[in-house]
Amino acid sequence: MKTPTFLPRLLCLALALAWTQGSQASTVFWGSQFNDNLFNSTGAALDSTYSFAIGTFGGFTPTYQNVDQWAANWHVIDIAFAPDVNGWNSTDQFFAGTVAFNPDGTSASPDANPADVFAQGSLVYLWAYNSQDIVPGSEWALVRDASLTTGNGSDPWIVPDPANPDPNASSNWYLSGASTEIIGGTNGVQGAGTYTATPGVFSLQTAVVPEPGSAMLLLAAAAAHLARRSRRLTRMSQP
């Protein structure tokens, strides 16, 4: 049975109340459940080497075929990482963050680039990784909310109005609201990537990152396999 999520969220609320004093507005609470099901490609629990970041890609669309371009187009809103127990706590398997947008559209997070301006309505992604470099052993999960509607305890993952004059304006971007996998898996669905295990239940699973160029080869191989299987089934069905 899972431990209630109230404690981490109360901690986030306390941080938010402190941060929203002054010129900041449009606070976002984001993260996972306490004692969540977070795994790597082998089915092992994610360890303290992982980080969890929320951000946008501007006008760039991330796909499995252009993984080598993600880092160059990534704009960080906030990051949760170890050893901050209220960021990424690998022992209790939860990550949590609270971040406010400034009226000019920049993020108040110390992990964000102060030059990055986030346009209202921009799609927000969650990127989990043990390294943003594509090297042997790198594992990623990149997921987002495809429905863009309130549900599963989460608000739509889109940048709110940073100039909202209400100091109590807030949004909740929780992992439970993720429904699209660019790489890795979320909420029981494995997306693109290489895995050696499939957990019975998972909220997030990272996948091995393909080396540049290999993603197209993998997709081509998969397409060829499906074509051969289709031809074989067609021959078997003929009298």
Residue ranges and their predicted role:
Residues 26-208:
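Mature extracellular "passenger" or substrate-interacting domains of secreted, surface-exposed proteins
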Residues 19-26:
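Sec/Tat signal peptide C-region and signal peptidase I cleavage site
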Residues 10-18:
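Bacterial N-terminal signal peptides
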Residues 7, 209-211:
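Hydrophobic alpha-helix-in-membranes signature
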Residues 225-239:
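C-terminal membrane-anchoring or membrane-association module
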Residues 2-10, 230:
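Bacterial N-terminal signal peptides that target proteins for export
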Residues 211-228:
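A short, hydrophobic C-terminal helix/tail in secreted or cell-surface proteins
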